[in-house]
């Protein structure tokens, strides 16, 4: 893991503003930070080069594009094999990158190995994904699903 760079109060103010609106102008940021536009531009470039700002994206509400069902799927993989060419973890990690329904995958401690956040149209789409994709993967031993009933908090902003 890379070491974090030192952020001062102005860097944090800039980051909070950019997380609220990634299209904010440098002039508006300058007003927020109490600096000139060129000083803000230099700080933003430094944050980008250091990887603190990874990218700028459009946030798309899943429901607005027909993906009304969110599922969290706990996945357990088969045990490691002696064959180095068939490592279940490596096979699964590679496969999950190609599944468009999976928008987030985290390796876990505890009973299950991975937690997937999956966006699908409806229960039929979910059933097809589980039956035809996830459970067909040779490394997957078991999975357990929970469905989102109501989203109480949903943010991409990091508390800086």
Predicted segments with their positions:
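A compositional/biophysical signature of low hydrophobicity enriched in polar/charged and small residues
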Residues: 1-160
